[in-house]
């Protein structure tokens, strides 16, 4: 399995990479939505994208809208953000997110979300 981590925080990218690699994922990273789209359009397929909402250059909402419009419909997308507002959650799900995980979170919550996406066994 391959995962793309899109977050402007190096700390968060490293943290998510560790969690994913423990579960056998191969990971790539991007620091903003535009760089994330560039990675996706490079032709290497990903099974999962973990996307923050608040990033420079292109935010997570714009990235979600673009990647779904560009045909990345099979790839699972999990929003990983500090935004806890219901409007943000609904907006992200409407834009094409498959799951939503609020920071901070623990290992169990992360595993549960991956299982809900069918990417790991419960």
Listing of model-derived features with the role each one plays in the protein:
Residues 77, 102-103:
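Residues at the ends of beta-strands that form strand-to-helix hinge/output surfaces
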Residues 55:
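Receiver (REC) domain active-site loop signature in two-component systems and cognate sites
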Residues 29-48:
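Acidic, metal-coordinating helix/loop segments flanking the phosphotransfer/catalytic sites
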Residues 105-114:
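C-terminal output helix
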Residues 14-22:
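Charged docking surfaces used in two-component/phosphorelay signaling
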């Amino acid at each position: 399995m391959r995962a793309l981590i899109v977050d402007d925080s190096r700390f968060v990218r490293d943290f998510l990479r560790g969690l994913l690699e423990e579960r056998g994922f191969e990971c790539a990273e991007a620091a903003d939505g535009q760089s994330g789209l560039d990675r996706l359009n490079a032709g290497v397929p990903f099974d999962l994208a973990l996307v923050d909402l608040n990033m420079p250059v292109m935010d997570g909402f714009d990235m979600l809208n673009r990647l779904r419009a560009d045909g990345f419909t099979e790839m699972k997308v999990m929003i990983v953000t500090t935004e806890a507002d219901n409007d943000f959650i609904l907006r992200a799900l409407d834009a094409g997110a498959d799951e939503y995980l609020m920071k901070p979170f623990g290992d169990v919550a992360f595993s549960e979300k991956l299982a809900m996406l069918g990417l790991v066994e419960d």
